[in-house]
Amino acid sequence: MSDRQAALDMALKQIEKQFGKGSIMKLGEKTDTRISTVPSGSLALDTALGIGGYPRGRIIEVYGPESSGKTTVALHAIAEVQEKGGQAAFIDAEHALDPVYAQKLGVNIEELLLSQPDTGEQALEIAEALVRSGAVDIVVVDSVAALVPKAEIEGDMGDSHVGLQARLMSQALRKLSGAINKSKTIAIFINQIREKVGVMFGNPETTPGGRALKFYSSVRLEVRRAEQLKQGNDVMGNKTRIKVVKNKVAPPFRTAEVDIMYGEGISKEGEIIDLGTELDIVQKSGSWYSYEEERLGQGRENAKQFLKENKDIMLMIQEQIREYYGLDNNGVTDKAEEVQEEMELEE
């Protein structure tokens, strides 16, 4: 053994003695280096994310204009986690969560952990406590813009508090990022949009809360309404464009288009028809849609209704789309065992 190798072995032993077993290792020693995921609740978004859903143990930022569907996107993720037997928490800093709507999206409101904190510090401390417990699979913070520092709440209305919120977020994310990774929790931060004053060239839009969240996020999603979906003169929902602006786990800049229907959320039937047609799994002839020998209906809305009534055909098409894109969710079910193993390693 060379002197260099002996010195390295001694250093590794010293690190493990001081910081615990598993604090340093060769990457090849890790049994499973794949990124495990949880479905987003939208097949089109799973495809755009490139790995079949949200990566576990990472920070996700979802931002966009008002009423674009940001909270809907987050609630669908919560519903997916709960469906797989996981635990979800919603930190409602805006005090605006509609439990009736959440239930319609498939959220089990009886089991959902809900906090409506008074200050930004309180919200982030609650988030940290939940993450460090290792027992929560997803934490949603709605929204970063509503995380008001305690000093601002206790101060007078006209007082200046420059950079307070940015400092709060920066400090919180420094503490949270390691704990989120270790506990394999998905942390979704919903954010709003602001206009930068005096920008002549380039994009004047920015997100509140400073730059820290942009850096710490593994995935950033921009949610925008594209057009209204009408039936006659009645507006039934919006076609919404979700752009993957940043992605550390797959190629970025992919876009997903989904139908967000009022009172229903993301239309799974709509995206299956769109993706199926794109891949020629669903055939379109004129205005008629068909799958193999089965006619789905004339016009997109009729085809959507057919799939809603015939779940078996919908699942068959969905399976073919997932197979084509190689999407495989190895999500929540084995999380408890993984976290337990890591804790034993540390001990």
Curated annotation (Swiss-Prot):
The principal location of this protein is cytoplasm
Cross-referenced InterPro entries: AAA+_ATPase (IPR003593), DNA_recomb/repair_RecA (IPR013765), DNA_recomb/repair_RecA_CS (IPR020584), P-loop_NTPase (IPR027417), RecA-like_C (IPR049261), RecA-like_N (IPR049428), RecA_ATP-bd (IPR020588), RecA_C_sf (IPR023400)
Q: Which SMART domains match?
A: AAA (SM00382)
Which Gene Ontology cellular component terms are annotated?
A: cytosol
**GO biological process: one example:** DNA repair
Matching entries from CDD domains are given as: RecA (cd00983)
Record's keyword terms, sorted: ATP-binding, Cytoplasm, DNA damage, DNA recombination, DNA repair, DNA-binding, Nucleotide-binding, SOS response
Superkingdom of this protein's organism: Bacteria
Q: Where in the cell is it found?
A: Cytoplasm
User: What SUPFAM superfamilies has UniProt attached to this entry?
Assistant: P-loop containing nucleoside triphosphate hydrolases, RecA protein, C-terminal domain
Any matching Pfam family: RecA
User: At which positions is ATP bound?
Assistant: 64-71
Gene3D superfamilies tied to this protein: P-loop containing nucleotide triphosphate hydrolases
Any one GO MF term held by the record is: single-stranded DNA binding
Q: Which family does it belong to?
A: Belongs to the RecA family.
Q: What does this protein do?
A: Can catalyze the hydrolysis of ATP in the presence of single-stranded DNA, the ATP-dependent uptake of single-stranded DNA by duplex DNA, and the ATP-dependent hybridization of homologous single-stranded DNAs. It interacts with LexA causing its activation and leading to its autocatalytic cleavage.
Identification of the protein by name: Protein RecA
| Species assigned in the record | Bacillus velezensis (strain DSM 23117 / BGSC 10A6 / LMG 26770 / FZB42) (Bacillus amyloliquefaciens subsp. plantarum)
Q: What lineage, starting at the top, does this entry show? A: Bacteria, Bacillati, Bacillota, Bacilli, Bacillales
